[in-house]
Amino acid sequence: IRLLENGWKVTIWASEFSPNTTSDIAAALWYPFLSAPVEKTDVWGSNTYKVLENLSGLPDTGVTMTRTYEYFRDAQSDPSWKAVVQDFECRTVDLPEDYVECFSFVTPVIEMPLYLGWLRKRYDSLGGSLRQRTIPDFDNLPDTFDVVVNCTGLESGVLLDDGEVYPVRGQIIRVRSSMSEMHLDQQIETLTYIVPRSEDVVLGGVAQQGNWNLDLSDADHDSILKKCSSIIPELRNAEIIEDLVALRPGRTVVRLEKEFIGDHSVVHNYGHGGSGVTL
């Protein structure tokens, strides 16, 4: 969309489009998670926060500025992104059991089915085109394109023989609830998130590095419900809509750089881990 806005002609090639993508499943909130290098992701994330904050004031974007509570079992230093978010404060009282500290702040929640629909309409209105197809590699692309932007995510591991790419398996539960505040425990060993949206609440989660399994796990389901209800007890009896599973596109560091492959100028843009909408 930014390329179209700046006068470029753009064609997207993809094997799948919404609603059949990993992005459609994502809980999707602004929060730097499983991404590096921090000195770059903090800058990118700061810019994204401002964009999402502006989008929250527009109709049909699916972006909502949401009061958020992040809980810790040990005392923490202030996060590097403290100055980016609205209304940041640290609390040490009135916390769920076993937690000793809480960061309270306002951050965007992005309801991905709505946001992807809004992006598609914006893209179409600017004259962008779509092609549903796959590519075996980057060596034999048509000469009709001046620049190729590689956003193939997890598939970059195969297409580019990139050994730094790995899956981070996630599983969530959608439940019915009227909650309006978000609750998080973003430590990998106790990962928990309760993300309110317009018609449901997303409960998570897991972040299983190197796990390619796309089957739903009963053990993960039970663990998610236990962790979330330990923070918000009424979720124990919430009506369950469905369970979903997908793979985050992990990498040791985000790859954003230019490379010449054959006669093509390729801009690599992948490895965003659990920070897709944040970056």
Map each language-model feature to its residues.
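Glycine-rich FAD pyrophosphate-binding loop
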Residues: 5-24
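Central beta-strand plus flanking loop segment that forms part of the substrate or channel wall
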Residues: 27-32, 66-72, 157-186, 225-236
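Short beta-strand to alpha-helix junction loop
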Residues: 37-47, 102-118, 215-220, 273-279
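Flavin (FAD/FMN) cofactor-binding and adjacent substrate-gating region
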Residues: 47-126, 251
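Flavin-binding catalytic cores
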Residues: 54, 165, 179-181, 198-202, ...
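C-terminal catalytic lobe of FAD-dependent flavoproteins
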Residues: 118, 238-279
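A conserved short coil-to-beta-strand element within the FAD-binding core of flavoproteins
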Residues: 128-143
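Glycine-/small-residue-rich beta->alpha transition segments that form the dinucleotide
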Residues: 145-147, 151-157
